[in-house]
Swiss-Prot record:
Full protein name: ATP synthase F(1) complex subunit alpha, mitochondrial
Annotated positions binding ATP: Q215, G217, K218, T219, S220, Q473, Q475
Localization in the cell: Mitochondrion; Mitochondrion inner membrane; Cell membrane
Membrane topology classification: Peripheral membrane protein
Self-association state and partner proteins as the record states: Homotrimer. Component of the ATP synthase complex composed at least of ATP5F1A/subunit alpha, ATP5F1B/subunit beta, ATP5MC1/subunit c (homooctomer), MT-ATP6/subunit a, MT-ATP8/subunit 8, ATP5ME/subunit e, ATP5MF/subunit f, ATP5MG/subunit g, ATP5MK/subunit k, ATP5MJ/subunit j, ATP5F1C/subunit gamma, ATP5F1D/subunit delta, ATP5F1E/subunit epsilon, ATP5PF/subunit F6, ATP5PB/subunit b, ATP5PD/subunit d, ATP5PO/subunit OSCP.
Principal location class: mitochondrion
Origin superkingdom: Eukaryota
Annotated organelle transit peptide span: 1-43
Cellular component terms (Gene Ontology): cell surface; extracellular exosome; membrane; membrane raft; mitochondrial inner membrane; mitochondrial matrix; mitochondrion; plasma membrane
Amino acid sequence: MLSVRVAAAVVRALPRRAGLVSRNALGSSFIAARNFHASNTHLQKTGTAEMSSILEERILGADTSVDLEETGRVLSIGDGIARVHGLRNVQAEEMVEFSSGLKGMSLNLEPDNVGVVVFGNDKLIKEGDIVKRTGAIVDVPVGEELLGRVVDALGNAIDGKGPIGSKTRRRVGLKAPGIIPRISVREPMQTGIKAVDSLVPIGRGQRELIIGDRQTGKTSIAIDTIINQKRFNDGSDEKKKLYCIYVAIGQKRSTVAQLVKRLTDADAMKYTIVVSATASDAAPLQYLAPYSGCSMGEYFRDNGKHALIIYDDLSKQAVAYRQMSLLLRRPPGREAYPGDVFYLHSRLLERAAKMNDAFGGGSLTALPVIETQAGDVSAYIPTNVISITDGQIFLETELFYKGIRPAINVGLSVSRVGSAAQTRAMKQVAGTMKLELAQYREVAAFAQFGSDLDAATQQLLSRGVRLTELLKQGQYSPMAIEEQVAVIYAGVRGYLDKLEPSKITKFENAFLSHVVSQHQALLGTIRADGKISEQSDAKLKEIVTNFLAGFEA
């Protein structure tokens, strides 16, 4: 009688959904009951209280836990897409694991199967293979431990320096901050490039698009910006530091290797994370890499620090997403891109933000790169990203081949919010420059048709040519903001109007060397005050005049 009661108690304790419980678990329960029956004689000799306590101990000591895993089987596999049957409770964008050890991500949740994109070579998977849920949405390691490292789209180290030591992980697909935590852009993000910092200034928390044809210097602007942050990151003021994340999407491995070497030579890798999903990587990894890099940048933003992320380039991410979507049988739209390709980029770029003080005051600045075909900015992806971002730096092939580098088209380039973040000193010297350059371009188009030009027009042309020369800058040689102010001051105030255009670059190099070596106090004053006072203006005028007299002589 006792053994029957014990068995009944054990069965009642088991889950009601008997279908989920393995037969082994039930069998072990009945074996335990039989063992109780065998020792019944011994139990009858003891007292009732002692007997019940022994029963409790034995029942509680029995391990009735069952490890349940939801698994499915591969129905078909090809082109990096697996159709899986049986994962009834899988979540969207959940990581799944194949029996070969490969990982994948569930994207299409259909009534009778799940469409899984494979992170790797699908030749290792065959029909009938078991697929199991991991229960985790795709996440990556984040934290300062990643600085100086090169990782793949899943956050695994690929630089041969051992595993990443970070204990913190973060989902790749987090929602962008709402309206309340944000604040308007107000701090400058200095690129060290004269043409950008003076004409299309960028603020911390801004999204500024770099757009242009191939081989026009888009990546160079991004790399110069990273190198320029060394002057701030070498200091001790955490508020001035800017951590950098460079996401390489669909590039050649040799290109990424050269880039890492360039950053290492400039001593910039120590504050930079490189996320690489090269052309030979699977399309899902190229799709995922920008989101992974963004999560790494958000760690700094949400901890009251400042970060810069460069997506190079989002055109290739859109192509990878188009490939996945078409293979998943999603309906194509314009240029065969799926209908949600706008959302693909908007949900990524909206995560760049300047947070208010109640939320730590951190920022994440985004510099997405888009490659155009023959300068066509009216194509689908370029127009999408232009409408999402807070401005664009437009690079032209024609200017590049004329030797104007960086090849920025000042007329088409704009920064919608950056002027609020521009330093006052730069506003004072560069305020009229954009207008003068615009007038120069307009007049230059007509000047080639006739030679009879009035003095004012000739003056406009003369000034425009010299300002264009002044904005030229070598690759990997970013300048401090106070040095830019000194050089642009000489051009805008007309001191270079009588100098031959061919001598402008030579003058600039000599003048900068002179100012840095002889007038460091003035540069320090401009840097500290953030503006040109009357005394600084008079001093600058004196320095430029005296130097020009000696330079021309």
